[in-house]
């Protein structure tokens, strides 16, 4: 009887090369739909090539990377993978546009224990849809099948984006001054932040989020609503008015932590929380988790996805341009002068909870 060891393959070790190749074939069309004229070549090369768009005198490249946090765990639990790709793109491109940059190209990293081609193709299709909304090209990515690193078909995502801005037109908050107006753009829900708290609240409440209805929609759908991509309306606002002094993408840390990132040292944002109706999903989360009002604004966006600073004299024009671009903006507050030790963001009219 032979004791010869059987011949092992990569597939025996848990890595299916054929599945990886099948995925690449399925997503080629997705990438092609996002192609910008500056992109040279398609998927499959060792590196992706992209020219700087014409018309820039002193182009500055802007880069960013992000993930979607534990919203991904919720997506896996619900077996809902069609919009998480848009979340990934949004988290990256919204960070780029706040300095005035136009997103050029995007790459993704998809890591999994066992590659499910259908799930991965659905995720990448969502990434492609996000790239189309942002006007950037999906130029490549990495699909890593890593048995033993992830449980079964669980996966993780990361995104990487590069954009370009004219050096003289970089928006950095340095011109912000007392009296300026703050304009808000609505979020679609929690976007991609605060999901560790959200998942804990769901656990503590014992709620079946697919059965709970808020405003006629299942809570699961409200929690999985894709992160809004603000790129096109904001670039339109910048181009048409030249009035934007600063922008803050309201992500993890909420209004309290994100607005100060774009303010000069002596500036304070005074926000009127009563200026908008908070979406019902946030009220449900606060009630079920007995979450303190300040904590809500430090963890969640509470209905505000982007804040824009313009001179008060430009506020009406900015609101007009944003409405014409399909947005529903409103004035959320103003800038005041403050001392070195003052709170950088003051929230007025907080609800008593």
Swiss-Prot record:
- Cellular component aspect of the GO annotation: cytosol
| Keyword Ligase in annotation | yes
Name the Pfam families for this protein.
Answer: AIRS, AIRS_C
Question: What sort of enzyme, by top EC class, is this?
Answer: ligase
Say where the protein is mainly found.
cytoplasm
Pathway named in the protein's UniProt entry: Purine metabolism; IMP biosynthesis via de novo pathway; 5-amino-1-(5-phospho-D-ribosyl)imidazole from N(2)-formyl-N(1)-(5-phospho-D-ribosyl)glycinamide: step 2/2
EC number(s) reported in the record = 6.3.3.1
User: What are the UniProt keywords, alphabetically?
Assistant: ATP-binding, Cytoplasm, Ligase, Nucleotide-binding, Purine biosynthesis
Q: Which reaction does it catalyse?
A: 2-formamido-N(1)-(5-O-phospho-beta-D-ribosyl)acetamidine + ATP = 5-amino-1-(5-phospho-beta-D-ribosyl)imidazole + ADP + phosphate + H(+)
GO BP terms: namely: 'de novo' IMP biosynthetic process; adenine biosynthetic process
Carries keyword Cytoplasm?
yes
The UniProt GO MF terms for this protein read: ATP binding; phosphoribosylamine-glycine ligase activity; phosphoribosylformylglycinamidine cyclo-ligase activity
> Where is this protein localized, as stated in its record?
Cytoplasm
Q: Which residues form the signal peptide?
A: none
InterPro entries membership: PurM-like_C_dom (IPR010918), PurM-like_C_sf (IPR036676), PurM-like_N (IPR016188), PurM-like_N_sf (IPR036921), PurM_cligase (IPR004733)
Question: Family assignment?
Answer: Belongs to the AIR synthase family.
HAMAP family registered for this protein in UniProt: AIRS
Protein name listed in UniProt: Phosphoribosylformylglycinamidine cyclo-ligase
Taxonomic source organism: Pseudomonas aeruginosa (strain LESB58)
Give the encoding gene's name.
Answer: purM
């Amino acid at each position: 009887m032979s004791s010869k060891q059987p011949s092992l393959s990569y597939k025996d070790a848990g890595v299916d090369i054929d599945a990886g190749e099948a995925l690449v074939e399925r997503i080629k069309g997705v990438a092609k739909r996002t192609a910008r004229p500056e992109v040279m070549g398609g998927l499959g090369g060792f590196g992706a090539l992209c020219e700087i768009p014409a018309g820039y005198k002193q182009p500055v490249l802007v880069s960013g990377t992000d993930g979607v946090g534990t919203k991904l765990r919720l997506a896996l639990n619900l077996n809902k993978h069609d919009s998480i790709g848009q979340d990934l793109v949004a988290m990256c491109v919204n960070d780029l546009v706040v300095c005035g940059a136009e997103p050029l190209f995007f790459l993704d990293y998809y890591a999994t224990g066992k590659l499910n081609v259908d799930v991965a193709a659905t995720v990448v299709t969502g990434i492609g849809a996000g790239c189309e909304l942002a006007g950037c090209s999906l130029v490549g990515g990495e699909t890593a099948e890593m048995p033993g690193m992830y449980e079964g078909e669980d996966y993780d995502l990361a995104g990487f984006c590069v954009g370009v801005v004219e050096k003289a037109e970089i928006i950095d908050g340095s011109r912000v001054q007392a009296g300026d107006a703050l304009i808000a753009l609505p979020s679609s829900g929690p976007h991609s932040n605060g999901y560790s708290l959200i998942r804990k609240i769901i656990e503590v409440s014992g709620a079946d989020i697919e059965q709970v209805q808020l405003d006629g929609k299942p809570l699961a759908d409200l929690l999985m609503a894709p992160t809004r991509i603000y790129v096109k309306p904001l670039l339109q606002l910048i181009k048409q008015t030249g009035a934007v002094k600063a922008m803050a993408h309201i992500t993890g840390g909420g209004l309290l932590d994100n607005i100060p990132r774009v303010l000069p040292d002596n500036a304070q944002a005074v926000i009127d929380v009563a200026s908008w109706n908070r979406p019902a999903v946030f009220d449900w989360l606060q009630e079920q988790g007995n979450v303190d009002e300040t904590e809500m604004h430090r963890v969640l966006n509470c209905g505000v996805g982007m804040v824009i600073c313009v001179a008060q004299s430009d506020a009406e024009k900015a609101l007009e341009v944003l409405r014409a671009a399909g947005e529903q903006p409103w004035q959320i507050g103003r800038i005041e002068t403050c001392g070195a030790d003052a709170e950088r963001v003051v929230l007025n009219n907080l609800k008593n909870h």
